[in-house]
């Protein structure tokens, strides 16, 4: 898949590193790798890519651990509950329609202040909303 190759090689144009493409990358790794390995590839890949386009991964910018793990868990749940083991055009189309891809989805589980805290960026924090 071209997106994955460009992501891994840090040749993906910055404007193509969209919210949606973050999810496509997560979907790919969650299908191709055991979950712990997928999480590592996603996390390390985002950090590496951010730096390759001039970004920094600090306690107030760049990679965000809680957001990454939250959404990777949602992707894994989607795959497991539907017994998906490969990516097809049909699966990708359905995946991209899922409610958890909407940017505001995470706000059902996290307050903005808590999610944007230094601690949440640097390490996993469980949701603060019921």
Question: Can you say where each PLM-predicted feature lies in the sequence?
Answer:
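Conserved, aromatic- and glycine-enriched, well-ordered alpha/beta core segments
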Residues: 9-84
